A protein has these predicted regions:
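Charge-rich, well-structured scaffold segments of protease-associated domains
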Residues: 1-121, 154-155, 185-329
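His/Glu-based metal-binding/catalytic segments typifying zinc-dependent metallopeptidases
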Residues: 88, 117-180
Length: 329
């Protein structure tokens, strides 16, 4: 099975050869997926177009139908040679893999006929003038149902990566996260919830989104502000949350898929303190409560904040929301 997996993996580096009929069929499937997902009408697309304006990550990964129409087999192969080059690829293996398996993988990779160049890509994004200087504005996209997305700009060079990850986990990510737990479990006023920490070497954005009844929009903003200010004041159980987060990371030792992502992404792609599972605190989590409080004070400010609401424009009191958000500063 491992040998078969090697063949599939190394096949990614082969020249793409398709008939015009097969290529057009594949393009048709991709365009159908784009239309079906209709991401351009989503709150997430609207939010990202504000946060990442004029940057490389403003556009959706899947692309647009008009872009797909311009793609050719020749263009794909040119891009493949540039991206799948020796200077831009690495292989990270986790799980029940023997030395014999690794030797076979190394041998197969060494035989690949790929470019030895490095395309010079960096894991950074262009920062627009609004980053860290956000306009005090509630961005509204008209809709019948009401959804809210709130995000904060992050300077990824200011604190070690473990500080941001723990702050994100503490407040927004997972069943025990303070914001999620309070809004959804302890005092349920939202219907759905999602969170993201979009992170690059220079900047990032911590954001979370949810659906809410239109009559509770102002209440939910008051609650969010109270929770963020509590984090800035240190009113949270740091030790319990640290232990819970480290317990989750320990579970990844039994999950080769998650472990592979963590080791490859944090140790080789992001410029953060590497993960060392032999270390009591995994290196990255030698974090103090004071660091979390300091980071919270720096991040959760109006100048870093983007608020996008999808709902009935006539029923949303933007001035009242803005008045509530003043308490963050």
């Amino acid at each position: 099975e491992f040998d078969f997996a090697i063949e599939i993996l190394c096949g990614l580096f082969d020249e793409i050869k398709l008939t015009s009929h097969d290529f057009n069929n594949e393009k048709g499937r991709i365009k159908a997926e784009i239309r079906e997902k209709d991401r351009r009408s989503s709150l997430d697309f609207y939010f990202n177009s504000i946060v990442w304006k004029n940057s490389e990550v403003e556009k959706i990964v899947l692309g647009y139908c008009k872009t797909i129409d311009r793609v050719s087999v020749k263009k794909i192969n040119e891009f493949r040679q540039k991206v799948l080059s020796a200077g831009n690829c690495f292989v990270y293996a986790t799980g029940n893999i023997s030395d014999k398996n690794l030797d076979a993988l190394n041998k197969k990779i060494s035989e690949l006929d790929i470019s030895q160049s490095n395309p010079g890509f960096t894991n950074t994004v262009t920062v627009n003038n609004e980053f860290f200087h956000r306009e005090k504005k509630i961005w509204i996209k008209n809709n019948y149902w009401h959804y809210i997305q709130i995000g904060f700009d992050v300077d990824c060079s200011k604190y070690p990566g473990g500080v941001y990850d723990l702050l994100y986990a503490l407040l927004f990510n997972g069943d025990k996260a303070l914001v999620y737990n309070y809004l959804s479990e302890d005092n349920p006023i939202i219907y759905s919830y999602d969170s993201t920490f979009e992170q690059y070497d220079n900047v990032g954005n911590i954001n979370f989104s949810f659906e809410v009844d239109r009559n509770k929009i102002e209440d939910v903003f008051k609650t969010v502000v109270e929770l963020l200010n509590a984090a800035k004041d240190g009113r949270f159980n740091f030790e319990a949350n640290l232990n819970y987060e480290m317990f989750n990371w320990e579970l990844d030792l039994d999950n080769p898929d998650n472990l592979n992502w963590n080791m490859a992404y944090y140790n080789h792609i992001l410029k953060t303190q590497p993960i060392d599972y032999s270390d009591e605190f995994y290196g990255r989590f030698r974090v103090t409560k004071e660091q979390i409080i300091d980071a919270a004070k720096y991040i959760f400010r109006r100048c870093n904040m983007t608020v996008a609401v999808k709902g009935d424009r006539k029923k949303i009191n933007a001035e009242a929301i803005e008045k509530i958000l003043e308490s963050l500063d």
